[in-house]
Structures are given as structure tokens and as C-alpha cells.
Amino acid sequence: MEVSIFDGIEPDPSVETVMKGADAMMKFQPDWIVAIGGGSPIDAAKAMWIKYEYPDCTFEDMCKVFGIPELRKKAHFCAVSSTSGTATEVTAFSIITDYNKGIKYPIADFEITPDVAIVDPELAETMPKKLVAHTGMDAMTHAIEAYVSTANCDYTDPLAIHAIEMIMKDLTASYNGDMEARDRMHNAQCLAGMAFSNALLGIVHSMAHKTGAAFADYGAHIIHGAANAMYLPKVIAFNAKDETAKKRYGVIVDYMGIADKNASDDDKVSALITYLRKMNDELNIPHCIKNYGADSYPVENGFVPENVFLERLHDIAVNAIGDACTGSNPRQPSVEEMEKLLKCCYYDTEVDF
């Protein structure tokens, strides 16, 4: 079997990396593309695959939601995941960063769902603790957002709920070095991916996509999983103003067993928010952007200056509203509400609107 290796994919892969990889594919002309690693290399390979199959396709064309032409005319795709969070090995999504604009763009189309996914828990056993924390909370966010998404259904709900139950039991243990828990987390994140690839996501991801690289000129990124972990409790509080979403959060809490089943839905939502914030503490993840250090750990003064955040707030909010994940959120925010929500995520203030 003749092979060619393309490596060196950076975290949060860039448009430029995608184009270089696509050039390498066009020279080698593979029948199969095998992407090995975490979310970044697999996501990058998905975008390269599109460009390989359609050389005239621009990055802007790729970003048109469910607008990718039929693939597999040149190659099939196999994904081998080595981290326990993105589940990109089973999803219709890829996240690519345009560093010139400081924006992460989701490519969303069922055409880019891999033909084969190899989910081997042993590959995740060497993950560093920080990666365990961030990818694990990414998976938790996938499952919760999928369950309350407007596109949820009878086929996705069991996957989402079981993933939540598994992550609740195993993530902190995995973080603290329990290898059996880490093995189970690898399966849990895949279940969460199967749920959200069909039920879609919500504005936690919209906000994470649009803040992740927005402050890269200040020397760091807001790592995707950490962003999800910080924003998820705030978005739950925002979405719970919608009665349907509030009831579904209540069902999640019933399965988790973290509140009395006879408690009100409002009390159950509060219990869920409290539980997730406690998880963030256990995983050494900050509660807000203001306290997000350049190394992703909690600090008194984070790397994003307040004046810079406020200066860029409106544009980030507009971009988040336009993100592919916003349409399936259970409560549709206005630009003004998105700005207020982002402020709550910066200062760690209560969501009361």
C-alpha cells in the first residue's frame, strides 16, 4: 500500500493549513484519507478532503451550511480519534480558523461525515490532564445542547442522555488518572457526537467559535472546550427562560439525580448550573473570560483586557448570531441579548434576561 503523510496540524487549524494539505492530496491522489488525532487534525483533513475533491471550491464556499457538493468521487475518509471530546470522527462538522479575521468557522454538511470511525479508548489514555478536562467538557456541552436543541428527536435523545450520565460519572475520575474512567469517556464523547451531529447544537458553540480566536493578537486563544465549559452555565440560564427548554433541562437533572424529582423546573435548572460550575472547579477551568489565563487556568486577571473585550463585543455578538449553531438553539437571541450574554460570560454575572 502506498502512503503519504501530512502532519504538523496546529491546534485550531487555519485556512492556510487546509490549503497546504489539499495541495499535498492533489499531488498524491489518495483513494482513502485517514485522519488520526484529536479534533484539529481530523477537522483539518475534512476540509482538505473537500478542496481535494473540488479544487475550485473556496473556503467561503465550504462555509455555506449544508452546501457541500457530493464527495467520495476521489476518496473515502477514515477518522481515528485520539482525544475524548470533539467526536468529529462521527460528525458532520469541521471547525477551521481564519486568523486574518480572528474567527472560527464551522463547516457543516453530512457529506463530511467520515465513512469509517475507529474509536479505540487506548489511544486516549496518554492525554494530558488539561486536555482531558477541556475535551470532556466539550463532550458534556455537545450532549446537553443536543438534548435541548430544536432538532432533537427520539433517536438523538437516548444518546445525549446516556452520554451525560457517563460524563457525569467518569470525567472527573478520568481527569484524576482513572484509566478505566478515561476509556469510558472515549465512548461517552462518541455517543455525544452521534447525538449532536443529528440534533445539532446551540449558542454555547456559537459563542465559543466566535470568541476562540477573537483575541489571538493578545497572545492566546480561548481553548474551545474551556470556552464551552465557561459559557454553558450562562447559556442554560438564558435558554431556561423558554418553557420547553426549561422542562428538558429538568429531565436531564432527573436522569443525573442531582435534585429532588418533585422539585420545580426552576430549581432543577439551578441545580444543573451549580453542578456544572462545580465540575469546572474540579477540572481547574475558569468561570469567566475575565479570569481566563493565557495558559487556560484560572487567574485574577486574564489575558483578555476588559477594554479590548468591550471594544470587540458588538462584532463578536453579530458573528455569533450568524454562526451555524445558532439556528437550532431553543431560544433565539437578538444581537443586544447576545452582547449581554457575552458580558455575563466575561464578568461571571447573573443572566436575568
Regions found by a protein language model. Give the residues of each.
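Short, amphipathic C-terminal "tail helix"
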Residues: 303-353
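Glycine-rich phosphate/pyrophosphate-binding beta-alpha loops
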Residues: 85, 190-228, 323-327
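Flexible, glycine/charged-enriched surface loops at secondary-structure junctions
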Residues: 151-159, 174-184, 199-204, 222-225, ...
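Short beta->alpha junction loops
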Residues: 5-15
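Gly/Pro-rich interdomain helix-loop hinge
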Residues: 214-217, 221, 225-308, 312, ...
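Glycine/threonine-rich beta-strand-loop-alpha-helix active-site module
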Residues: 16-23, 27-122
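Carboxylate- and glycine-rich phosphate/diphosphate-binding segment that chelates Mg2+/Mn2+
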Residues: 93-199
